[in-house]
């Protein structure tokens, strides 16, 4: 259901990027399933989880983390991300990870991060990462966000929002504030459950500020 007026070339590029991302998600999921013994049965996994020895406690911690990652990858196979940012940090900016100062990068945001092993390249950035502030609070043009090593300033040239369902790209739109309001309205109208299942895709600037507020400082919310 291609309802936006973006060029066909953009649709083709985004569909290919989605297909490549889903292939990475499937590959990472398969590695975890094989590592956990899920493909060949759960006997070894259950035996370790039931063992009460000290060594087993360490293994249990590792296994539970892997199970959590596996659960996230399974959900990501239906919707790996919901937005894209094109951002160029200023030269000398204290950026981390896959961003490079002075170079424009496309950043895809999802409910969870997706790393491609063994290179550990960031394919999808977690919505809680510092750079995701640009999606919730930034407008096209000069922007900044707080990173662990200091403030990162630069140029935001694109904010694109996606509707992806069961691994299929259904809609996308490039947006500033007005477009984001429309996306919020459309997303909420499609919620058939009383529970907002995809709330991270519809957070607005003021809500984002509250979510990221220092947990050890007082905060008063009115209304």
Segment roles from a protein language model:
Residues 1-200, 204, 208-213:
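Extended, charged low-complexity regulatory segments
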Residues 218:
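Walker A (P-loop) ATP-phosphate-binding motif of ABC ATPase nucleotide-binding domains
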Residues 221-222:
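Hydrophobic anchor at the beta1->P-loop junction of P-loop NTPases
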């Amino acid at each position: 259901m291609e309802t936006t007026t973006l060029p066909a070339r953009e649709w083709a590029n985004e569909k290919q990027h989605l297909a490549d991302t889903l292939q990475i998600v499937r590959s990472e999921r398969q590695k975890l399933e094989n590592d956990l013994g899920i493909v060949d049965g759960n006997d070894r996994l259950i035996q370790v989880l039931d063992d009460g020895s000290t060594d087993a406690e360490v293994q249990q911690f590792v296994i539970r983390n892997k199970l959590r990652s596996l659960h996230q990858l399974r959900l990501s196979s239906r919707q790996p991300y919901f937005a894209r940012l094109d951002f160029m940090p200023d030269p000398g900016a204290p950026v981390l990870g896959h961003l490079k100062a002075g170079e424009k990068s496309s950043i895809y945001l999802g409910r969870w991060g997706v790393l491609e092993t063994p290179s550990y390249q960031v394919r999808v950035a977690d919505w809680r990462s510092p750079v995701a502030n640009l999606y919730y609070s930034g407008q096209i043009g000069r922007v900044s966000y707080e990173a662990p090593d200091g403030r990162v300033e630069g140029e935001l040239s694109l904010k694109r929002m996606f509707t992806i369902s069961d691994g299929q790209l259904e809609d996308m739109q490039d947006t500033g504030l007005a477009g984001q309001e429309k996306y919020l309205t459309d997303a909420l109208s499609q919620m058939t459950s009383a529970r907002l299942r995809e709330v991270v895709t519809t957070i607005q600037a003021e809500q984002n500020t509250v979510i990221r507020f220092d947990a050890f400082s007082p905060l008063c919310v009115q209304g």
